[in-house]
């Protein structure tokens, strides 16, 4: 069936209805033809019109007789029958885009199929994604074969796609690439045509039409750059002497607004250098730029004017100062924003070259001052939390002879005199302390001598002087606490004795019982028998 343009216009759900020639072997690798049936069913599920062939000669004759009946061909190739499949590929590649499929994954076979003209090589089993996108090869072949070589079946496809893409392309161009408001070519033409309207007179001998053209091109590249007089003298840092220039020359100045303002120059004063052939001499001809077509006055920065400028900069801050704000604070009517901006740039550069070390020293001093409060707080904390030394200081200079190594550990403290007596009262006046494991020594006579402020090195400190360490108070047990401990041990003899108390010996117990009038003491055998009876 021949597809006409009218039929194609009704093809709304493209690529549905795509005609596919499916050439399969008579028997696949499984031997039951299930793979061929699956491939056909998958293509038909995508609304493709599938025509199946099992003989290469029959399929080739159908393509030759009715080329408009097919849009694409899918051919299966096997290692055993490569020659027949390749014959169909060589004959049909100029008419239909041909896709080769195979169950054997062989690089040599794949390369041979692509070399003979196959558009793609797919390995079975075929995925639905691959079969869904085979229409892309149809469109690709329709657009890349040329108008005269496109087959009859692909011409309607190409015309339909061209009509759709043409509309979309126009819309894309209008949206993405709008016509510029000021085309660059138009600007160039205006600059070149300006030579007919502008008459620039130079006071140089070797200035021709080519020099004027180069001058205009250099001026266009500069853009918003400001005019600077080229002189043989050096500019003073504090005083800038400029001349007043007059002119009506029109100059195109590109800014953010994109506006172009033209002026016409009657005469331009050009200062020559030693080498008059340098480009800077010709570029100095176009200098005067003014937005309101008035002559620009270049002021002389006198000391009084510079003083006002410095005061305004210091009030705003060197880093935050801008020309417009400086101009408002100075309140000088003869100055312009351009004059202030130029002078501000020179002022910052001059300050940067002269004051780098002073700024560095200021920052170093400031950081040091910020660090001092932390150091003061640490000293106050160290004074309030003075450590308590449990040992006297040793190893001071002058204690040991020269060359001698002081010992690592301090010498032991030497006690002077006897310790103070410890008066302890027994819990009962009739019971000896030895009977219950509390030995009581004889009373000690004598006085306890308090050691003076003497260190191990022999240094004497006066009374009341601070020696750097504190004497810990001697801790003595309280009599009430001792009485309570002894009473608890007597009332509960089955409990372990507290620390410091020893169990009484058998001799001391018998002696105490005899002293109290208890003479009959049961033997150990009686105690054992009594215990059995209690059980």
UniProtKB/Swiss-Prot annotation:
Species name: Arabidopsis thaliana
DNA-binding region: 298-348
Function as written in the Swiss-Prot or TrEMBL entry: Transcriptional activator that binds specifically to the DNA sequence 5'-[AG]GATT-3'.
Compositional bias segments (type: Basic and acidic residues): 211-249, 261-279
One GO CC annotation: nucleus
Domain Response regulatory: 25-139
InterPro entries attached to this UniProt entry: CheY-like_superfamily, GLK1/2-like, Homeodomain-like_sf, Myb_dom, Myb_dom_plants, SANT/Myb, Sig_transdc_resp-reg_receiver
Xref: CDD domains: REC_typeB_ARR-like (cd17584)
Name of the gene: APRR2
Family per similarity comment: Belongs to the ARR-like family.
Subcellular localization: Nucleus
Molecular function terms from GO: DNA-binding transcription factor activity; transcription cis-regulatory region binding
Entry annotated with the keyword DNA-binding: yes
Name this polypeptide is given: Two-component response regulator-like APRR2
Biased composition (Polar residues): 280-293
Region of interest called Disordered, as start-end residue ranges on this chain: 206-298
Example GO BP: positive regulation of DNA-templated transcription
Subunit and interaction comment: Binds the target DNA as a monomer.
PANTHER family assigned to the protein according to its UniProt record, in alphabetical order: TRANSCRIPTION ACTIVATOR GLK1, TWO-COMPONENT RESPONSE REGULATOR-LIKE APRR2
Keyword line: DNA-binding, Nucleus, Transcription, Transcription regulation, Two-component regulatory system
Disulfide links within the chain: none
Gene3D superfamilies for this protein: 3.40.50.2300, Homeodomain-like (1.10.10.60)
Main location: nucleus
């Amino acid at each position: 069936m021949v597809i006409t343009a009218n039929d194609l216009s009704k093809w709304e759900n493209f690529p549905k209805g795509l005609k596919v020639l499916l050439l399969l072997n008579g028997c696949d690798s499984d031997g039951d033809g299930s793979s061929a049936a699956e491939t056909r069913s998958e293509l038909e599920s995508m609304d493709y019109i599938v025509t199946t062939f099992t003989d290469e000669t029959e399929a080739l004759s159908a393509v030759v007789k009715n080329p408009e009946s097919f849009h694409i061909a899918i051919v299966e190739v096997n290692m055993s029958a490569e020659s027949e499949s390749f014959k169909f590929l060589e004959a049909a590649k100029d008419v239909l885009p041909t896709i080769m499929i195979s169950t054997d994954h062989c690089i040599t076979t794949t390369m041979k199929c692509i070399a003979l003209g196959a558009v793609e090589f797919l390995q079975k089993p075929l995925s639905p994604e691959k079969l869904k996108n085979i229409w892309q090869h149809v469109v690709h072949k329709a657009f890349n074969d040329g108008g005269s070589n496109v087959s009859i079946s692909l011409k309607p496809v190409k015309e339909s796609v061209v009509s759709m893409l043409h509309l979309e392309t126009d819309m894309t161009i209008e949206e993405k690439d709008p016509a510029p408001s000021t085309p660059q070519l138009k600007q160039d033409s205006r600059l070149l045509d300006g030579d007919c309207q502008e008459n620039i007179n130079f006071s140089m001998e070797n200035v021709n039409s080519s020099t004027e053209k180069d001058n205009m091109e250099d001026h266009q590249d500069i853009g918003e750059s400001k005019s600077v007089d080229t002189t043989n003298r050096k500019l003073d840092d504090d005083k800038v002497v400029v001349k007043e220039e007059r002119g009506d020359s029109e100059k195109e100045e590109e800014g953010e607004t994109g506006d172009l303002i033209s002026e016409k120059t009657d005469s331009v004063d050009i200062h020559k250098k030693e080498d008059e052939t340098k480009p800077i001499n010709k570029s100095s001809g176009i200098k005067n730029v003014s937005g309101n077509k008035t002559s620009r006055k270049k002021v002389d920065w006198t000391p009084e004017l510079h003083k006002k400028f410095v005061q305004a900069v210091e009030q705003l801050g060197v880093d935050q100062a801008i020309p417009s704000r400086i101009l408002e604070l100075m309140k000088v009517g003869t100055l312009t924003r351009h004059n202030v901006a130029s002078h501000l740039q020179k002022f910052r550069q001059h300050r940067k070259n002269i004051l780098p070390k002073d700024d560095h020293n200021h920052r170093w001093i400031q950081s040091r001052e910020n660090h001092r409060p932390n150091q003061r707080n640490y000293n106050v904390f160290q004074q309030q939390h003075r450590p308590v030394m449990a040992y006297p200081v040793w190893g001071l200079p002058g204690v040991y002879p020269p060359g001698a190594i002081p010992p690592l550990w301090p010498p032991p403290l030497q006690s002077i005199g006897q310790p103070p007596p410890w008066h302890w009262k027994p819990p009962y006046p009739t019971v000896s302390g030895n009977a219950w494991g509390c030995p009581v020594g004889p009373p000690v006579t004598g006085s306890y001598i308090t050691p003076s402020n003497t260190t191990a090195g022999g240094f004497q400190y006066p009374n009341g002087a601070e020696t750097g360490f504190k004497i810990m108070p001697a801790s003595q047990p309280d009599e009430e606490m001792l009485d309570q401990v002894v009473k608890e041990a007597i009332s509960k003899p089955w409990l372990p004795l507290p620390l410091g108390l020893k169990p009484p010996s058998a001799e001391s117990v018998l002696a105490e019982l005899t002293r109290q009038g208890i003479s009959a003491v049961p033997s150990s055998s009686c105690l054992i028998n009594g215990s059995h009876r209690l059980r």
